[in-house]
Curated annotation (Swiss-Prot):
InterPro entries: YaaA
Coiled-coil ranges per UniProt: none
GO biological process: response to hydroperoxide
Name used for this protein in its record: UPF0246 protein Aave_1172
Taxonomic source organism: Paracidovorax citrulli (strain AAC00-1) (Acidovorax citrulli)
HAMAP family: UPF0246
Protein origin, superkingdom: Bacteria
């Protein structure tokens, strides 16, 4: 079973890492290098327009692309699970996981990425900004979905090859999950939906839903979840499985009071 996460825009390369933290390298360094070469051709102004970001952010990322190297070291990179710093990753709270938990996560969590394709939790990554929905034209086509093609699905298939009944639990946004060619994916896909009570009904509230995706990943790591039925036990921060609102491959978790 694999749990898919989106990356985060916010990054943390300052907080000291846990001592003795293991590291691995991303599987698609060659492809990332190709994308960096395309990005380096663009001015900060072009990046601002392409990505819909401020001039200051465009300048920062132009500098990141210029500094990017196909050699990943402790000086220029850090493990993905500790580099991303957003709502999802606050819910996951990697720093509180023990070594066994991190090793389990390494085998069962996959972070989708516009620049890196897929990252394992302990894969080193250099800082970047490149959302999967960016219309960055390459030799493969008009956007990153065309660039990545079937690569991400095939990578996930390889990671699931030893499973008798391969399952992907999608905790990523639709923007990122769209990068997985489901026609090429040889696995059942289960979507987890998190709803909060507001205005007299249950609805998806972005901030809470993002955090809940991280909480679900944390729950899976802590409980070593390897079967879909185990997901129904998720109960962190007041959420509970609602069978009446769920379908076989769409599990709905609801919370009455966010507190």
């Amino acid at each position: 079973m694999l749990f898919l996460l989106s990356p985060a825009k916010s990054l943390d390369y300052d907080t000291p890492l846990p001592p003795g933290l293991a590291h691995t390298l991303p599987p698609f360094i060659h492809e990332s290098t190709q994308l960096i070469e395309v990005l380096r051709e663009k001015s900060p102004q072009e990046l601002a327009s392409l990505m819909g970001i401020s001039d200051a952010l465009a300048g920062l990322n132009a500098a990141r692309y210029a500094a990017w190297s196909p050699r990943f070291t402790a000086a220029n990179a850090r493990q993905a699970l500790f580099a991303f710093n957003g709502d999802v990753y606050e819910g996951l709270d990697a720093r509180s996981l023990d070594g066994d938990g991190l090793r389990w996560a390494q085998d069962h969590v996959a972070i989708l990425s516009g620049l890196y394709g897929v990252l394992r939790p302990l894969d080193r990554m250099q800082p970047y900004r490149l959302e999967m929905g960016t219309r960055l034209a390459t030799g493969a086509g008009a956007n990153l979905y065309r660039f990545w093609g079937k690569r991400i699905a095939e990578h996930l298939n390889q990671r699931l090859a030893a499973d008798a009944t391969p399952v992907v639990v999608n905790l990523a946004s639709q923007e990122y999950f769209k990068s997985v060619d489901t026609a090429a994916l040889k696995a059942r896909v289960i979507e987890c939906v998190f709803e909060d009570w507001k205005g007299g009904r249950y609805k998806i509230i972005s901030f809470h839903a993002k955090r809940a995706r991280g909480l679900m990943a944390r729950y899976a790591i802590q409980h070593r979840v390897v079967a879909p039925r185990q997901l129904e036990g998720f109960d962190l921060e007041g959420y509970a499985f609602d069978a009446s609102a769920s379908a076989q491959d769409r599990l709905v978790f609801r919370r009455k009071d966010a507190g």
